[in-house]
Amino acid sequence: MAGRSLGKAVATVSLSVALASVTVRSSGCRAIPAPRNPFPSCGFHLKANIMSGSNGVKDNSHNKARTSPYPGSKVERSKVPNEKVGWLVEWQDYNPVEYTAVSVLAGPQWADPQISESSFSPRFNEKDGHVERKSQNGLYEIENGRPRNPAGRTGLVGRGLLGRWGPNHAADPIITRWKRDESGNKITHPVSGKCILQFVAIKRKDCGEWAIPGGMVDPGEKISATLKREFGEEALNSLQKSSAEKREIEEKLHALFSQEHLVIYKGYVDDPRNTDNAWMETEAVNYHDETGETMDNLTLEAGDDAGKVKWVDISDQLKLYASHSQFIKLVAEKRDAHWSEDCAADSHGL
């Protein structure tokens, strides 16, 4: 579980956003007063960060990957100004700090050895045994035997808290349902007139911020299996259940995770754990319980890396871990659900 604990994913929007073509319409909703922000004090609200290519970024991107101190340490990154982020920009004086966490250097199962070890010969940009070293964003460059972050400089080399050289793959399941009144009717927002969508949110133990459940893809594991496993562990506390309870949870989740779904995003993640040589990538997938019956038969219970779990109304007032709010906005748009009281903002999207 250590690898999963260290690898909880955050994400922003890049050119590799993958959106399904389906737009789900809703009707028959009842209006209620506008909901208040359920998370007034946690997280931060990010703008969309769009990668402009494998060797350069726009001015408003690649921000979290340059923040100091590095998570879980007192290590300060070398400062990288916006105009020097891209690798195509010559910077002879660039002198990044070297840092790899002790927990990674200890050689757990989820971590690679050091590049300098003679017995370690990773096959970058391809499937390396059970380890996926291909990037969702295409080929990445190798410099002096080390992968180079496709989004640009971060001010730090090594792996930090990340186990793999190059891409570290994660998955984020976004489970949604319509908000309903006591009679079972869908509820609309009084200003936008659109039905209110809800999603399952967890409160992370490591930073106390609310987020989408999710975690690292285990070696050899399919993304679909990771999505279901992580939701069960964090939102249903499946790790602490009896064998019979686990089977029951598995059967109910199978019904939800087997239906049609929307791939909201996949690709590079602007994450504070990223370095010049190791970075996060994720696939965020929306599973929607249209009638609400499947999730009504499952009791939410925080587990694993989650301190709390609950259903949350979706709107632009949400402040979530990293840029999870961007994923949630995309879900609201694809489901034609309420997002903002500002109609113009709704129509412009990202």
Curated annotation (Swiss-Prot):
Its EC number is 3.6.1.13. Residues 1-46 form a transit peptide. The modification Phosphoserine is found at S121. GO terms for biological process: ADP catabolic process. InterPro entries: NUDIX_hydrolase-like_dom_sf, NUDIX_hydrolase_dom, NUDT9. Residues 178-334 form the Nudix hydrolase domain. Monomer. Interacts with GLOD4. This is ADP-ribose pyrophosphatase, mitochondrial. The gene is Nudt9.
